């Protein structure tokens, strides 16, 4: 019989100091990069996302040395949907989630192979780029022009984004993915920013949280996606007034019971310790939450045998909740965990490496411009 909410709350470990079993979580993420259990088979087309949870989790635990970085980088580049020689598929470029289509292995920047069903997926492009930066790659083999062209093709007239060019649901999740892609590539030509901002603004609900779209229910995940997107754009305080931001802060801070839930009257769930916690961090009021209750709830979902975190106590751990549980603990500066960048959802070490990359691109572009001017004169 499933545990009631009261039983879950009672089992949250409040009042006792629970240990964070770092080494077991390292081994859990290692296994996620190898052979996955049968129950993960339906996620084969999203394997790159599972790799992101594992790699970023290891990065947060300062344990990337346990993986073969070069092999994984080659695998990720083999998932890049590259332009064909005639560039007829430019609006389909990005990263796919795995090799399920049987496209020839091609980790280079050579022209892609035409396939009628091959296209990038917006979430896979986001996680693929994130993984490359996490692993220390310089993104030199990323066809940035093609990724941005593929991204532009996914934006709808209302400012939201689809996941794939054939069409799919369109909501705040993919606005966030698009914002991360543009931020990582240091090029916002991949979207009509004004339309995206309008979409985020119209998604504010009557109770002051953000929904997946206009007229829908406020949700902790979509509130994070909207607020984080605006922070990456550098537009948060331009879009919402101080009064509106205070209302959003109140909605978010009311999501804490012991851990956090995503909507009123819903059970708490490990992943919202990041989704809502990171939003509060971006809004600069995370320090007013109850760290002890949140920590105890997260650790009550820790699998003490195999590592990882579940959404609820006494449930099976999975890659998503394992990663976001660690990120939630990072927001509270748990010992043994690196700091997380609350908007980009990677370690601050990785975000700083990305800024160094941006600076090197800028220096390279300036040098090329100077050389071109010198040649023309």
From Swiss-Prot:
Residue positions binding Zn(2+): 269, 271, 321
InterPro entries: GGTase_I_beta, PGGT1B-like, Prenyltrans, Terpenoid_cyclase/PrenylTrfase
Pfam family name, one: Prenyltrans
BP GO terms, sorted: protein geranylgeranylation
Catalytic activity as recorded in UniProt: geranylgeranyl diphosphate + L-cysteinyl-[protein] = S-geranylgeranyl-L-cysteinyl-[protein] + diphosphate
Gene Ontology MF: a single term: protein geranylgeranyltransferase activity
Family, similarity comment: Belongs to the protein prenyltransferase subunit beta family.
Function: Catalyzes the transfer of a geranyl-geranyl moiety from geranyl-geranyl pyrophosphate to a cysteine at the fourth position from the C-terminus of proteins having the C-terminal sequence Cys-aliphatic-aliphatic-X. Known substrates include RAC1, RAC2, RAP1A and RAP1B.
Protein name from the UniProt record: Geranylgeranyl transferase type-1 subunit beta
Organism: Homo sapiens (Human)
Record gene name: PGGT1B
